[in-house]
Swiss-Prot record:
Its EC number is 3.1.26.4. It holds the Pfam family RNase_H. PANTHER family: RIBONUCLEASE H1 (PTHR10642:SF26). This is Ribonuclease H. Residues 120-263 form the RNase H type-1 domain. It catalyses: Endonucleolytic cleavage to 5'-phosphomonoester. It comes from Schizosaccharomyces pombe (strain 972 / ATCC 24843) (Fission yeast). GO terms for cellular component: chromatin; nucleolus; nucleus. GO terms for molecular function: magnesium ion binding; nucleic acid binding; RNA-DNA hybrid ribonuclease activity. The gene is rnh1. Residues 56-85 have a biased composition (Low complexity). Belongs to the RNase H family. Mg(2+) 1 binds at D129, E171, D191.
Length: 264
């Protein structure tokens, strides 16, 4: 039992600060980054303290901040209002922050690009994925996967409930499961552009258009979209796009969990 002791890799200064479960993940954030600060710990609490003390010694705005994903950052807004609260200059899109890079970064526990002052350990990152076997065909079966980390008991692998066994519904439900099984600041990484855009770019427009698409058709999967939106309404949540079926370890694990759920 002693040989499987869990390690925590704290990155107090790097491309994306946070606490990582493997060295491969952490090293991507510090290799080639001038003035990096990182250390391995046997406990989450010690890694957390390192991030707080070492991270506070440096300006959060110094040095490059690069990531390969597209990040959609949420700040809390009132669920009773049809309008999203603002973060940037536009009425709606200031709730959405995007950052791009050609450099590949993988699974992270990071601060949102607009909230780097938050202690790195206060935000967790999970991967969510959905899978539908025979998607769009008769007899399709779908599953949802949420990956928290290697051997993490919180990892989720379940079949998709309901009659509609589509990939899009599985992707949305996976995000819902990630939200329902966490608390506090959260980053969800997904390879579903549909899910991310539904909850960010498109939802404000749909609300103004009586939940109709640009072609005046009813919005599909609105039950899941509204559920996810409600769960995000009182939390600081970021949705980050990662390329599916690539070398991203976290996405691979979430996909495996989703496929397993579809096979149950």
């Amino acid at each position: 039992m002693g040989g499987n002791k869990r390690a925590y890799y704290a990155v107090a200064r790097g491309r994306n600060t946070g606490i990582y479960s493997t060295w491969d993940e952490a090293s991507d954030q510090v290799k080639g980054y001038g003035g990096n600060r990182y250390k391995k710990f046997d406990s989450y609490e010690a890694a957390q303290e390192f991030c707080r003390t070492e991270g506070s010694r440096y300006s959060s705005s110094s040095g490059p901040y690069r990531r390969s994903t597209t990040s959609y950052g949420y700040s809390p807004y009132s669920s009773s209002s049809s309008n999203y609260s603002a973060r940037h200059s536009d009425k709606y899109r200031k709730k959405i922050s995007r950052s791009y890079s050609t450099e590949k970064d993988i699974e992270i526990f990071s601060n949102d690009t607009h909230e780097k002052s938050i202690a790195c350990s206060d935000r967790q990152v999970v991967y969510a994925d959905g899978s539908s076997l025979r998607n769009g065909k008769k007899g399709a079966v779908a599953g949802c996967g949420v990956f928290f980390g290697n051997d993490d008991p919180r990892n989720i692998s379940v079949p998709l409930a309901g009659e509609e066994q589509t990939n899009n519904r599985a992707e949305l439900q996976a995000i819902i499961l990630a939200l329902e099984n966490t608390s506090g600041d959260l980053t969800i990484r997904s390879d579903s552009n549909y899910s991310i855009k539904s909850l960010t770019t498109w939802l404000p427009k749909w609300k103004k258009n009586d939940f109709k698409t640009s072609n005046s058709q009813p919005v599909k999967n609105l039950d899941l979209i509204n559920r996810a939106s409600d769960l995000m309404s009182d939390r600081n949540v970021s949705l980050e796009y990662v390329k599916g079926h690539s070398t991203d370890y976290g996405n691979q694990q979430a996909d495996m969990l989703a496929r397993r759920g579809a096979s149950e």
